[in-house]
Amino acid sequence: MRWLNLLFLIFCHGLLSAQCVSVSGFVKDAVSGEALPGATVRTMKNATIGLTTDGNGKFLWTANQSDSLRVSFVGYEDAVVVIGLACEIEVKLTPSFTGLDEIIISSERLIAEEFTMSKIKKLEIYTNPSAKADPLLAVNALPSATTTDESANISLRGGSPNETGIFLNNVPINDAVRYGQLNGIGTFSIFNTALISQVQVYPGNPPLEFGNTASGLIALTTDEMIPTKAIHTVSASLASVGYYTSRKVGKGAALTGFTNFQPSGLLRWFNPVALERIKRFNTVDLGVHFFSRLSERTALKIFTYANRESFLFDSRTPTFRGNVNQEKARSYTVTNIRHRFRNSELSFNHGLSFSRARFSQSTLDAQLDLTDFYTSLNYQYFGTKLEIKTGLSYDYRGSNFEGKFPRYRYALGEQFPVDSTASRQAIRLPELYLYGKINLTPKWIAGGGVRKGISTNEQSGFLSSQLNINFRPTKPWNFILSMGRYNKMVIPQGISAESTQIQTDQYSLDVSHTKQHLESALSLFVKDGQQGDQQTHLRGIELYGRYRIHRNLRTQLSLTSLRARQTLKGETISSPFDIRYFIRGNAEYKFGDTWTATFVFLFREGSFYLPVVGAHFNSSVGAYEPIYDRQARLPNYSLIDFSFSNLFAVGKNASAVAFCGLSNVPNFKNVRDYTYNFDYTLKTAEYYALRTIYFGVVVSF
């Protein structure tokens, strides 16, 4: 009997030892395997008790063997798990759509996907303080980004923003920025992050399945999720109030709508010094997205968007100090239809866009109307080793500019002479393309293609071509060699009345090494271009490293160096992107299960400008005309940002993320340009954004 009692005690001790004080859990997408941060975990006994997963999709639960947990996440089916004796549990949530065929046609894969360098996920856009929850600003955090003006006009690897192609669902989006000036520079993009599922970035050698792109390419894709129940999201921050909803319509369709209002009052009140020059801004936008699986193999996607914005800021020039007013209204619609055959796919893409912008500053009073029409038909074959994609496209871009403007750039006051102009220009660009990719061996992939621009009455034809090679000798290593010639027709805007062609020759070698905790990459690239009489020559190198020190701490560091020259009429000077170093990095720390703190920095060499060394008084005009010296560099640029966020449950069926960001924490005075007094004897520095605070909350239910 004593032996039985002893065995019983040993057995009970084993059971007690097997029960964990706490249980660690991991929640992920059942299809893609990706972690799901912000998923809600609650006990079945009491729905008011719960927590949310951290930024890695993990959670820690105080163990109780009898506990049953309900795990939920917006856009996914709920899952119920019993803890039992497990110390670790993995929860797979199924996306809210049904049927294997539906999953097969749920997204369109780029044929040149193996030659991409960067993919940005939705969560990365929200958690990066430099991105300000904007998809295009998130691109500026990449090592390949060489944007120097803190705007959403993206430069990649030293290319002009005019050379960068931006596509939404395979349709080019021109003028994709808000608060844009007459020169095209804009502060934010027009894209709603809540609707974007992924951003793919080609820093150079853009795939020729996309047309009219001369340098880098940014491809955005909207979500194709069909929720089983209605999804609602309400957001509020210092500069915006928004509402987003998505619901299932019929058997296999989803209808999504959103609207945002962005006033400037609160943001300016919290940041009176940093935003001293901004008098007012506001935006109202509305978007509707419809996705339908018309059949097991056919999908339809329609997205329409409209916005109205205004921007008033203080301008200071030698001959005028006063307000600059900008107003703009625009709308666009993107339609996609694709049908999947057994080993191939046929797709049709269409885009239509209209915009009207008005600018006024002293005697400048101008209106710019832009019209874009795009359509393409594509066929893609999926073989075991060979993939081929071919198609044709037609791209129309029209510009209508009229107004009055100062006759002399240095005489902007109302007392100086003005000229009036009216111009109407357009480009019509039909193109044919063919791209093929072959898996030579399990380690080698080769791709290549051509794209022919057909000549019209407005412009001559051109031929673009490229070659890509991907080599994976072992699992952690990846080598990508790319080269090609690319062409782009630039739409005329503003006073400029002639469209121009940009042609670039590019060569790049990208090497990456990825292990469990360490990612590293090296890129070497060469780019030679021509636009009109101007030639550009660029050489560059990128170094990148990303290391997870432990479960809660991740760091990233990159160095980009550019040597860029431009030649015009026999004279060679440094280009605006001749910058010897961009040093950027970040550190992300997760604590308390749901809190995340992020530290971001950027240091770069100052860009070039033309200093004024004197002035000549033009008596016929009544103003001083500046005399410029040779190029000089602005002071070096430094930026440090900090943000933190918290994921938490709200009530029984909702979750929220609260965030707060502080930009330019040390309040660096980064010089953007210089302004002068009337006779150019006194110089004053103009600065980029000073220290700025921004916070808000997003609630999903």
Show which residues each predicted segment covers.
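Gram-negative outer-membrane beta-barrel transporters
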Residues: 439, 525-528, 533-613
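Periplasmic N-terminal accessory/gating domains of Gram-negative outer-membrane beta-barrel systems
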Residues: 77, 87, 110-164, 170-206
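A beta-strand signature from Gram-negative outer-membrane beta-barrel systems
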Residues: 91-92, 188-229
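Membrane-embedded beta-barrel scaffold of Gram-negative outer-membrane proteins
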Residues: 349-351, 357, 472, 500-542, ...
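Flexible loop and strand-edge segments within Gram-negative outer membrane beta-barrel domains
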Residues: 264-267, 276-281, 298-374
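Short, acidic Ser/Thr/Gly-rich low-complexity loop/linker segments typical of extracellular
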Residues: 47-58
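C-terminal beta-signal and adjacent terminal beta-strands/loops
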Residues: 605-617, 639, 645-701
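Short, acidic, small-residue-rich periplasmic hinge/interaction motif at the N-terminus
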Residues: 28-32, 39-44, 72-76, 84-128, ...
